[in-house]
Amino acid sequence: MSEKIANYYKTVDFKRYSSIHIGPIKEVLVINEIGDYSDFQIIGRGNNLLISPKCEKKFAILGEEFDYIKDEDDLLYVGCATSSGKLLTYTRKNDIASLEFLAKLPGNLGGLVKMNAGLKSWEIFNYIHSIKTKDGYIKKENVDFSYRQTKIDTIVYEVVFHKTKGFSKDMQNEFTKMRDNQPQIASAGSCFKNPKGDFAGRLIEAVGLKGYRIGDMEFSNNHANFLVNHENGTFDEAITLDRQSVV
């Protein structure tokens, strides 16, 4: 039996680590033990994350002890440090259905669950049985979640999925195609949630902001709802662009 890994700190350069390639260098706690970390903000793989150079918050990520997949009977137990790519590969190799929408969706499982990630009508909570926090397992029906958000205010260490057979390569290919129009450069992902009955990207384009740029930050010409960094974008440029689009 392998020896348990303790918590430790590591230095993270958020200009390299975050998907938008903006941010300071900070010491980050790597959590390998279940406990109370209410003083820390969990950041996952740094997707949809924009950190001010003046930020004084304490950050943490889940470590190696929470990167696992356990297949038991009709349930799948997955640690929240597990990447979406690793989980998708496992379900494909083991002919497990329902998670094909993870194709080309970046991030670790913890972040995907926190924001109820998905694509169009597919979302991760559709397939969840329960989640595990420091207080134990919580059934899905006792979690407050909705479109692209949850009200989970604690760390989720593990997710339990319902398991059914029948992985669909056709569905995986369809989800891959749906995301092929997304920018391939540094990005914070979708900037605004879709309002009911419409699409944020369409609205941004309708008011003439598709391709609008301040410095190296831009609302992408490929997909208007994506805030992209052409190389040397700054926190202030990103915030100014966001605020101008809201105004």
Protein language model regions, located:
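FAD-binding glycine-rich core of flavoenzymes that anchor FAD
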Residues: 34-42, 64-112
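Active-site-proximal helix-loop elements at catalytic-domain edges
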Residues: 7-27, 59-80
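A short, hydrophobic C-terminal helix/tail in secreted or cell-surface proteins
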Residues: 246-247
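Structural signature of FAD isoalloxazine-binding scaffolds in flavoprotein oxidoreductases
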Residues: 21-23, 27-32, 50-68, 114-141, ...
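Phosphate/pyrophosphate- and phosphate-bearing ligand-binding catalytic cores of soluble enzymes
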Residues: 15-19, 49, 134-243
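Short, well-ordered, mixed-charge alpha-helical segments that flank or form enzyme active sites
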Residues: 85-87, 108-116, 121-123, 138, ...
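A gly/ser-rich beta-alpha-beta helix-loop segment of oxidoreductase catalytic cores
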Residues: 98-129, 187
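N-terminal, positively charged, Ser/Thr/Ala/Gly-biased leader segments
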Residues: 1-43, 48
